[in-house]
Amino acid sequence: MARIAGVDIPNDKRVVISLTYVYGIGLATSKKILAAAGISEDVRVKDLTSDQEDAIRREIDSIKVEGDLRREVNLNIKRLMEIGSYRGIRHRRGLPVRGQNTKNNARTRKGKATAIAGKKK
């Protein structure tokens, strides 16, 4: 397995797919990286030369990925919570942030439903 940006990417997959295993690199970014490095998308990771791997690493170094990106996202969320914006309050309460209804659904954000005691008829 090749190690790129601190992540072991699978050898048997195409490079364009394998790069998406790195946090912050999706399919579109992966294609841009390979185009800039001058590498075909159809090449398998195990067939890459060390020069090609180095070219990919150089391109990825110019992009914010993995730990740096996670840290930035978390800092942005903390900033929203500190300034007391609506989105920050929703994050703090563990509710959906992007305007979804919460009357019936939103179980992923709210957690498991708890029974209300003494509500028998």
UniProtKB/Swiss-Prot annotation:
GO molecular function: rRNA binding; structural constituent of ribosome; tRNA binding
GO biological process, one term: translation
UniProt feature, compositional bias: Basic residues: 106-121
Annotated Pfam families: Ribosomal_S13 (PF00416)
Highest taxon listed in the record's lineage: Bacteria
Protein purpose: Located at the top of the head of the 30S subunit, it contacts several helices of the 16S rRNA. In the 70S ribosome it contacts the 23S rRNA (bridge B1a) and protein L5 of the 50S subunit (bridge B1b), connecting the 2 subunits; these bridges are implicated in subunit movement. Contacts the tRNAs in the A and P-sites.
Protein family according to the UniProt entry: Belongs to the universal ribosomal protein uS13 family.
HAMAP family on file: Ribosomal_uS13 (MF_01315)
NCBIfam families the UniProt entry points to: uS13_bact (TIGR03631)
Protein name per the record: Small ribosomal subunit protein uS13
Organism: Streptococcus uberis (strain ATCC BAA-854 / 0140J)
Lineage: Bacteria, Bacillati, Bacillota, Bacilli, Lactobacillales
Gene: rpsM
